[in-house]
Amino acid sequence: MATKNEQVLEIRPIELETVTLKIVGDTPLIMHAWSEKAKREMLEKQMKVTKTKSRDAKNPVEDFIRSMYWLTDMPTDMTEEGFEKAIEQGARFGFPVTAFKQAAISASYRMGWSKDKMSLRGVFFIEGDENQMIEIHSDTPIMREDMVKVGMGTADIRYRGEFRNWWAELRITYNKNGQYSLEQIVNIINAGGFVCGVGEWRPERDGQFGSYHVAT
C-alpha cells in the first residue's frame, strides 16, 4: 500500500513592530477640507436637484475655518473673533493619515524603488485616530487668499488655512519578517515628503507646499 508523501511547511510568523517617526515640514502645509456645504452642493448636482435660490455670498473667514481638519470642535461663530476664541481654547488640527502613506507609496514608485504601487500597500500601516487623522502641530494657522481655475477655466478666489513651522508624529506598524526593513520604510516615507508632499499645491501637483522630511 502506497504511503502519502508528507510535506513539512514552515510558516514564518508575522512579527509586528510599531515605531514613532517625527516628520518636520519643510514648506507650509495648505489644507482644503471638503466642507459640508461643498458635499451637499456636489450631491445636489449629481441628483440634478433644481436650485431656485441664487448663489450664497462668499464668506472668506468661514471658507478659511471650514478648509481645515478640526480635531476639536469647529467654532459655530464663523468670524475672526470666533476663530481666535477657538485658538485660545486650545484648538487642535489634523490631516488625513492616508495622505502620508499615499505620498510614500507614490514616491517609492517614482524613484524606482518598487515595481508598482500595489505591492507597498500592505508593507506598513500608519496609525490614525478614530477618523483616520493625525495631529498637525504648528504656528497658529493663517488665512491665505489664492486665485484658482475651476470647472471650464473659470477664475475663483479660495480662502484656505496655511500651517507654518508644522510637524507631526507618525506611528508606523510593519512586519519585522517582511520584505522591507525598517530602514527602507523610513527612507520611503522620507522620500514621500520630498517627491510628493501633502495638501494643496504639493510637489506631486506642480507646487512646492506641503513637503517634509523625517527628523533624525
Residue ranges and their predicted role:
Residues M1-T216:
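RNA-interacting cores
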